[in-house]
């Protein structure tokens, strides 16, 4: 029997194995029971990405909600995650159910639940839903009615939130400036950003080179992640077309971004977050704090110090950053895994917003991303990051908790200045370098993150991190 577990971004499973209609109905019933117990009213926005059966899962979910007396606002087509968050807030809904596995391979699907404040559900919420769902597994504890009956009872409404979201985006992005950039490469990666990432640009007469613009549940045969190793076709397009000054891409559900500079160089998300933070303060004159996850580059910290701005360090998971955005405490918050949002926008990762912000920055500054990054290094110092997955033998996996409980006072030739156990174990060294060890909860793997001022020093730090994991 499947055990329902909500991870960092919801419950995910493999289609036809554990992600089946029966389990989807159980989880939906658990969400309905949670909302009713909490006294939440206002209905639930239901969306899905382009994966197989996404629309069918969404309709079955609406049937269960209707039987529980909860109204559904069912998206008429596959819809970006940040747009679902926007619609929750716009309609003052009780929450949102999103059928997506984000950047995971095509054989996966998932349920992401968002509460009424529009961000990712916090642990106390997901634990309650998880508990309710697992108590129901193996029993027919849900009710459902037909979609026709739900509609007659006023418990089902089909919606298309695209126009309202794009109209809101018009207020937050200087699209007129983007017109001056030259040609843009645009890559929605067969995902939900089709018609979102291109339409505002075309409406302004921006010259774009659009690829991967049709729905494909296989996402072209790769995980729908706009990371360097999965977008070789897009990088080649940008590199080989001299008219293109910037390439922008999103993942399958459009909550993550990918940026390719005009010369074909892929720019890591860590650097984009820091650049946009600096841009929002220096050019847009925005005020407030900044947030990053524990695994994200300290280049963000350096920019914060440069501008005299408070920094919040959070566990991994955008839900914690989203909470700070909803509380109006920060200008921008971001994660190294290519998620960010800004003050006044949805408290959820928005890859569409991120792409347009980068395009605006490049257009208004009149410089490439690479040039802007070098200038930022000149002001605040250089930071180089790396991440590796280290596989553990059964013997090492058994002793690893004891290793991170008894840490050295010196590693990689520098003393440990600070230990942070916010999410995993992070060692900040006296020379500004740092290491983070995060054990996977589902497999015998430690995620090793490191950062230093030079590639040589980073190699030393990462080597020391690997040796600590494997040898102690």
Go through the PLM ranges and name each one.
Residues 9, 46, 84, 97, ...:
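Buried hydrophobic positions in well-ordered alpha/beta secondary-structure cores of metabolic enzymes
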């Amino acid at each position: 029997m499947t055990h329902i577990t909500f991870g960092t971004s919801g419950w995910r499973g493999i289609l036809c194995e554990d992600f089946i209609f029966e389990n989807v109905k159980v989880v939906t019933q658990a969400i309905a029971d949670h909302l009713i117990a909490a006294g939440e009213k206002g209905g639930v926005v239901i969306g899905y990405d382009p994966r197989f059966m996404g629309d069918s899962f969404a309709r079955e979910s609406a049937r269960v909600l209707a039987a529980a007396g909860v109204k559904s606002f069912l998206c008429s087509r596959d819809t970006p995650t940040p747009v679902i968050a926007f619609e929750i807030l716009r309609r003052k809904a009780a929450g949102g159910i999103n059928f997506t596995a984000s950047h995971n391979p095509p054989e996966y699907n998932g349920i992401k639940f968002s509460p009424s404040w529009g961000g990712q559900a916090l642990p106390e919420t997901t634990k309650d839903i998880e508990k309710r769902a697992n108590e129901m597994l193996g029993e027919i504890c849900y009710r459902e009615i037909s979609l026709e009956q739900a509609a007659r009872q006023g418990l089902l409404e089909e919606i298309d939130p695209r126009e309202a979201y794009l109209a809101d985006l018009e207020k937050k992005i200087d699209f007129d400036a983007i017109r001056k950039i030259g040609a843009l490469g645009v890559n929605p990666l067969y995902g939900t950003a089709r018609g979102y990432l291109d339409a505002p640009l075309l409406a302004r007469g921006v010259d774009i080179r659009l690829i991967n613009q049709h729905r494909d549940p296989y996402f072209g045969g790769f995980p729908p992640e706009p990371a360097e190793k999965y977008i070789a076709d897009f990088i080649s397009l940008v590199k080989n077309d001299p008219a293109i000054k910037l390439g922008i891409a999103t993942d399958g559900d459009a909550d993550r971004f990918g940026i390719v500079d005009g010369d074909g160089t892929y720019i890591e998300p860590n650097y984009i977050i820091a650049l946009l933070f600096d841009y929002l303060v220096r050019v847009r004159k925005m005020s407030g704090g900044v947030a990053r996850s524990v695994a994200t580059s300290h280049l963000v910290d350096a920019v914060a110090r440069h501008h005299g701005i408070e920094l919040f360090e959070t566990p991994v998971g955008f839900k914690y950053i989203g909470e700070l955005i909803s509380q109006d405490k920060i200008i921008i918050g971001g994660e190294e895994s290519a998620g960010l949002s800004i003050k006044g926008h949805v408290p959820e990762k928005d890859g569409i917003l991120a792409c347009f912000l980068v395009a605006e920055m490049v257009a208004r500054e009149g410089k490439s991303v690479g040039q802007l990054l070098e200038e930022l290094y000149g002001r605040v110092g250089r930071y180089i990051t790396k991440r590796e997955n280290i596989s553990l033998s059964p013997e090492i996996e058994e002793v690893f908790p004891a290793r991170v409980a008894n840490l050295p006072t010196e590693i990689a030739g520098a003393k440990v200045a600070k230990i942070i156990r916010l999410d995993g174990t992070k060692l900040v060294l006296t020379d500004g370098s740092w290491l983070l060890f995060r054990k996977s909860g589902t497999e015998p793997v430690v995620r090793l993150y490191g950062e230093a001022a030079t590639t040589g020093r980073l190699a030393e730090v990462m080597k020391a991190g690997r040796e600590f994991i494997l040898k102690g």
